[in-house]
Amino acid sequence: MANTRSAKKMVRKIAARTDVNKARRSRVRTYVRKVEEAIASGDKPAAQEALKAAQPEIMRSVTKGVTHKNTASRKVSRLSARVKAMA
Protein backbone atom coordinates (compact mmCIF):
# COMPACT_ATOMS: atom_id res chain seq x y z
CA MET A 1 0.00 0.00 0.00
CA ALA A 2 1.25 3.48 -0.87
CA ASN A 3 2.33 5.44 2.20
CA THR A 4 3.34 8.89 1.00
CA ARG A 5 1.13 11.44 -0.73
CA SER A 6 3.22 11.27 -3.89
CA ALA A 7 3.00 7.48 -3.96
CA LYS A 8 -0.79 7.64 -3.59
CA LYS A 9 -0.94 10.13 -6.44
CA MET A 10 1.20 7.86 -8.61
CA VAL A 11 -1.18 4.97 -7.91
CA ARG A 12 -4.05 7.12 -9.20
CA LYS A 13 -2.08 8.24 -12.26
CA ILE A 14 -1.04 4.70 -13.12
CA ALA A 15 -4.65 3.50 -12.83
CA ALA A 16 -5.84 6.27 -15.16
CA ARG A 17 -3.05 5.58 -17.66
CA THR A 18 -3.81 1.86 -17.56
CA ASP A 19 -7.45 2.54 -18.47
CA VAL A 20 -6.42 4.74 -21.41
CA ASN A 21 -3.91 2.16 -22.65
CA LYS A 22 -6.47 -0.64 -22.36
CA ALA A 23 -8.88 1.37 -24.49
CA ARG A 24 -6.20 2.04 -27.11
CA ARG A 25 -5.16 -1.62 -27.19
CA SER A 26 -8.78 -2.69 -27.54
CA ARG A 27 -9.28 -0.22 -30.39
CA VAL A 28 -6.30 -1.68 -32.26
CA ARG A 29 -7.59 -5.22 -31.72
CA THR A 30 -10.99 -4.19 -33.12
CA TYR A 31 -9.41 -2.80 -36.30
CA VAL A 32 -7.24 -5.91 -36.71
CA ARG A 33 -10.28 -8.15 -36.19
CA LYS A 34 -12.17 -6.27 -38.95
CA VAL A 35 -9.30 -6.95 -41.36
CA GLU A 36 -9.18 -10.62 -40.37
CA GLU A 37 -12.95 -10.99 -40.79
CA ALA A 38 -12.75 -9.44 -44.27
CA ILE A 39 -9.91 -11.82 -45.16
CA ALA A 40 -11.90 -14.81 -43.86
CA SER A 41 -14.95 -13.78 -45.89
CA GLY A 42 -12.81 -13.62 -49.04
CA ASP A 43 -13.79 -10.02 -49.85
CA LYS A 44 -10.53 -8.48 -51.08
CA PRO A 45 -11.78 -4.88 -51.58
CA ALA A 46 -13.27 -4.88 -48.07
CA ALA A 47 -10.05 -6.33 -46.67
CA GLN A 48 -8.01 -3.63 -48.39
CA GLU A 49 -10.26 -0.90 -46.99
CA ALA A 50 -10.13 -2.43 -43.52
CA LEU A 51 -6.33 -2.64 -43.72
CA LYS A 52 -6.15 0.97 -44.85
CA ALA A 53 -8.15 1.95 -41.75
CA ALA A 54 -6.24 -0.37 -39.40
CA GLN A 55 -2.71 0.60 -40.38
CA PRO A 56 -2.72 4.17 -39.00
CA GLU A 57 -4.46 2.99 -35.85
CA ILE A 58 -1.80 0.33 -35.26
CA MET A 59 1.00 2.84 -35.82
CA ARG A 60 -0.75 5.39 -33.58
CA SER A 61 -0.50 2.89 -30.73
CA VAL A 62 3.28 3.09 -31.17
CA THR A 63 3.38 6.87 -30.85
CA LYS A 64 1.18 6.64 -27.75
CA GLY A 65 3.54 4.13 -26.17
CA VAL A 66 1.08 1.23 -26.07
CA THR A 67 2.83 -1.03 -28.58
CA HIS A 68 6.48 -1.49 -29.51
CA LYS A 69 7.46 -0.28 -32.98
CA ASN A 70 8.58 -3.71 -34.14
CA THR A 71 5.36 -5.35 -32.93
CA ALA A 72 3.23 -2.85 -34.82
CA SER A 73 5.34 -3.21 -37.96
CA ARG A 74 5.05 -6.98 -37.77
CA LYS A 75 1.25 -6.79 -37.42
CA VAL A 76 0.92 -4.45 -40.40
CA SER A 77 3.32 -6.52 -42.48
CA ARG A 78 1.56 -9.81 -41.81
CA LEU A 79 -1.91 -8.38 -42.37
CA SER A 80 -0.88 -6.72 -45.63
CA ALA A 81 0.78 -9.94 -46.81
CA ARG A 82 -2.43 -11.87 -46.10
CA VAL A 83 -4.53 -9.28 -47.95
CA LYS A 84 -2.12 -9.29 -50.89
CA ALA A 85 -2.22 -13.10 -51.07
CA MET A 86 -6.01 -13.12 -51.49
CA ALA A 87 -7.21 -14.32 -54.89
From Swiss-Prot:
Residues 1-22, 64-87 are annotated as: Disordered. Gene3D superfamilies: Ribosomal protein S20. Binds directly to 16S ribosomal RNA. Belongs to the bacterial ribosomal protein bS20 family. GO terms for biological process: translation. GO terms for molecular function: small ribosomal subunit rRNA binding; structural constituent of ribosome. This is Small ribosomal subunit protein bS20. One of its GO terms (cellular component) is small ribosomal subunit. It holds the Pfam family Ribosomal_S20p. Residues 1-15 have a biased composition (Basic residues). The keyword Transit peptide does not apply. Keywords: Ribonucleoprotein, Ribosomal protein, RNA-binding, rRNA-binding.
